[in-house]
Regions:
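Alpha/beta-hydrolase fold catalytic core
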Residues: 1-91, 113-116, 155-156, 264, ...
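Short beta-strand/loop motif that positions the catalytic acidic residue
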Residues: 277, 283-285
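Flexible "cap/lid" loop of the alpha/beta hydrolase fold
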Residues: 175, 184-215
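Acidic catalytic loop of the alpha/beta-hydrolase fold
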Residues: 288-292, 316-317
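Conserved HGGG/HGGXW glycine-rich cap/lid loop of the alpha/beta-hydrolase fold
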Residues: 78-128
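Catalytic histidine-centered segment of alpha/beta-hydrolase-like enzymes
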Residues: 314-327
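Conserved alpha/beta-hydrolase catalytic His-Asp/Glu region
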Residues: 196-197, 215-276
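Active-site loop/oxyanion-hole signature of alpha/beta-hydrolase fold enzymes
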Residues: 120-161
Length: 400
């Protein structure tokens, strides 16, 4: 592999831990799994929980989620970066092309307060995850790695959320193994007829893909709200900075995922399989997304029989620009379509709708799930709420 191992001070603070004898991860596989606990990456001077809210300071004690970063080593010695926080219904997030899971820390920390256990996984060749041995010649290779990570973490069922390329991966994962998915949330995902046409065109005209990549870079650079909210820009910059440095040091890591997207099969069958399997799908998309046009989402929702959420004025990376909008959308859906999904999942597990997070989590994780070991405790701090209102507005369209 071309990725550097943990070095220097970080390496001195890493620990390799074997699974207990006789224990297995959720599916009974890989008893030899090893976990490197990266205590440096999992701790910062201040939790990144977003901009301070408008409420005045108080003496109220509030729980502050901290997304802990770890590097796990699978049974075949493949290193994978994961970030974990919270307790409750598992939500697995897969990031977009050139990103990594920790960039979504602010949004994920808000989901924790809603009763979710969030797990962000770095895709092969991104973040702390090694590239694939073959260079990742097709997207199925990335999906198979995700499935192995879930098995070895002990996550049996989850809500799968994916942004951009991550949306394609979680859709493909759920379509191939519907029993894993409680629901699928596609966020400006590269699935749908419009995107498929762009991919077909790029095979004959490579500059098309170069243009799409340029649009993605421009959208990412516009993510930092320097003038609108300098404090938020500084916090987000703490997350984005190391990612950009990593790309500058090893730019070749992006070649594999880019080529894999160009070689990917049309997403039509994947979306239709989700609908035929009865997997609840929510398609959330910005109506000003230039790299992945909004028409892509309309087609994806139609083919998967999913709920379409239109983020007004949202560009491709709106979910990074405003950490409040996605949790607000999920909160609204939990009073609507997702309420039925959650109740059905809990009922199938023999739980009541008001079951405590510990029971909910236990129902969807394996008995020796290592993801529990990776989960940090909530911090209790004195102060006011630290959230603004969501920057974007949206509309929700139920399937016909």
């Amino acid at each position: 592999m071309d990725d550097d191992p943990v070095q220097g001070e970080d390496a001195a603070m890493a620990e390799v831990i074997p699974l207990p004898e006789g224990a297995s991860s959720g599916s009974g596989r890989s008893p030899a799994t090893r976990i490197i606990l990266d205590t440096v990456a999992g701790s910062t001077d201040e939790p990144i929980v977003g901009p301070a809210g408008d409420a005045p300071p108080t003496d109220q004690v509030v729980a502050v989620p901290r997304l802990a970063r770890h590097e796990i080593v699978l049974a075949d010695d493949h290193r994978v970066g994961v970030a974990v926080c919270g307790q409750g219904l598992p939500v697995v997030l897969v990031h977009g092309f050139t990103a990594e899971g920790i960039l979504y820390a602010q949004t994920l920390s808000r989901l924790v307060a809603m009763g979710f256990k969030v797990v962000a996984i770095d895709v092969a060749g991104h973040g702390a995850t090694q590239g694939l041995p073959t260079g990742g010649d097709d997207l199925e290779s990335y999906t198979r790695l995700l499935a192995r990570v879930l098995d070895e973490l002990g996550i049996r069922r989850a809500v799968f959320a994916g942004h951009s390329m991550g949306g394609r991966l979680v859709a493909q994962l759920a379509a191939a193994d519907p029993d894993r998915a409680i629901a699928v949330v596609l966020i400006d995902a590269v699935v749908g007829e419009c995107w498929d046409r762009l991919i077909r065109l790029s095979r004959f005209a490579p500059p098309v893909m170069i243009g799409l990549a340029a649009l993605l870079v421009a959208d990412t650079l516009s993510t930092l709200p320097l003038l609108r909210n300098p404090s938020q820009a500084a916090k987000l910059g703490r997350l984005v900075g190391p990612v950009l440095v990593g790309h500058a040091r090893r730019p070749w890591r992006m070649f594999g995922p880019a080529i894999s997207m160009m070689r990917s099969e049309p997403s039509r069958r994947i979306l239709e399989d989700l609908g035929e399997a009865g997997i609840p799908v929510v398609v959330i998309h910005g109506d000003r997304d230039m790299p992945v046009p909004y028409a892509t989402a309309v087609d994806a929702a139609r083919r998967s029989a999913g709920t379409l959420v239109t983020v007004k004025g949202g560009t491709h990376s709106w979910v990074l620009k405003d950490p409040e909008t996605l949790p607000a959308i999920i909160a609204e859906l939990l009073d609507g379509p997702l309420a039925r999904v959650r109740a059905a999942a809990l009922g199938a597990a023999g739980l009541r709708a008001d079951a405590p997070p510990t029971q909910v989590e236990r129902a969807f994780l394996g008995p020796h799930a290592w993801v529990r070991r990776l989960t940090p405790p909530l911090e209790l701090r004195t102060g006011a709420a630290r959230h603004h209102r969501s920057r974007y507005e949206w509309t929700v369209s139920e399937p016909a």
